[in-house]
Amino acid sequence: MDQAKSKALEAALSQIEKQFGKGSIMRLGSDRTMDIDVISTGSLGLDIALGVGGLPRGRIVEIYGPESSGKTTLTLSVIAEAQRQGLTCAFVDAEHALDPIYAAKLGVNIDELLCSQPDTGEQALEIVDILTRSGAVNLIVVDSVAALVPKAEIEGEIGDSHVGLAARMMSQAMRKITGNLKNSNTMCIFINQIRMKIGVMFGNPETTTGGNALKFYASVRLDIRRTGAVKEGEEVVGSETRVKVVKNKVAAPFRQAEFQIVYGQGISKAGEIVDLAVANNFVEKSGAWYSFEGNKIGQGKANTMKWLLENKPTMDKLEGMIREKLMSKPQAETSARLATQEELADDY
């Protein structure tokens, strides 16, 4: 770039920053660290599958799945992890179905959790926008998009046609809150339900409610499914759960994680650590016995999990080893890619 153009560009950049604030425009390569501020999901496997160690702050996240698949449990787990970091959380309960006793069992501090039960969809989304613009709330959960009923539909009669009202409402809200979420570094999680498209012969007939705007604006979309039951003898004590990262703007998508949700306790962290430690050869499995550093720690997965819960230092050590091995790769790849870009730039 010649000197005259360079001076003109610098003057334009200076004017933009003066008018709209510092950081309103920048060179993409100026911030080499590219560190993403995240909140853990409470699931070690899912944090790894997300590629950055959790859900990104300042972004929109969508979690969807069938009924009783663990959507609310996963979001309450995220809230509990956020509160452990000292963050302020809000729960917009459009379904009017939040159980504070269950939330407390999952580790949520219900005394510190802000909760709203709005009457209309517009009211719910306006509350989200006000909380976001305040800059004082770090995580907002909306449960659920399907329950965000437009005011016109509530005031009308059953049987009245309201085609596209919810989709238009969501589209307008996404345009309004996305920039505010980024500026305030607030994460907004939308829980969504599944519907079936009528007359689909080929492909997946499943779709989510609320139109297409949320699909486009969400940085992360998680598809959560119940794959089986967790039993103790004949009694069902939980569910096997699989989460697929359907969309990811901050790392590689299409990874998945499997974990157990134990009724009344939430995500089984010990179970995940056992599975991941065996898969990465930190724990040896011989027949039914599990061994760590040459010592037998349990016969069967259930006993091994129990042993880990009773020996917290070993459990923390294993978690650290798993995180170090599986979460350091993306950073190393990023550094290598930046180094390659610098070499190419030098060649030119």
Swiss-Prot record:
Asked if the record carries the keyword Zinc, the reply is no
**Where does the record say this protein resides?**
Cytoplasm
| One GO BP | DNA recombination
Q: Name one GO molecular function term.
A: single-stranded DNA binding
Top-rank lineage group of the source organism: Bacteria
Its GO CC terms are: cytosol
Q: Which residues bind ATP?
A: 65-72
Question: Which CDD domains does UniProt cross-reference here?
Answer: RecA
Is ATP-binding one of the keywords UniProt gives this record?
Answer: yes
Entry keyword set: ATP-binding, Cytoplasm, DNA damage, DNA recombination, DNA repair, DNA-binding, Nucleotide-binding, Plasmid, SOS response
Main localization (coarse): cytoplasm
Return the annotated region ranges for Disordered.
328-348
What does the UniProt record say this protein does?
Answer: Can catalyze the hydrolysis of ATP in the presence of single-stranded DNA, the ATP-dependent uptake of single-stranded DNA by duplex DNA, and the ATP-dependent hybridization of homologous single-stranded DNAs. It interacts with LexA causing its activation and leading to its autocatalytic cleavage.
Q: What family does the database annotate?
A: Belongs to the RecA family.
Name listed for the protein in its UniProt record: Protein RecA
Question: The organism's lineage?
Answer: Bacteria, Pseudomonadati, Pseudomonadota, Gammaproteobacteria, Pseudomonadales
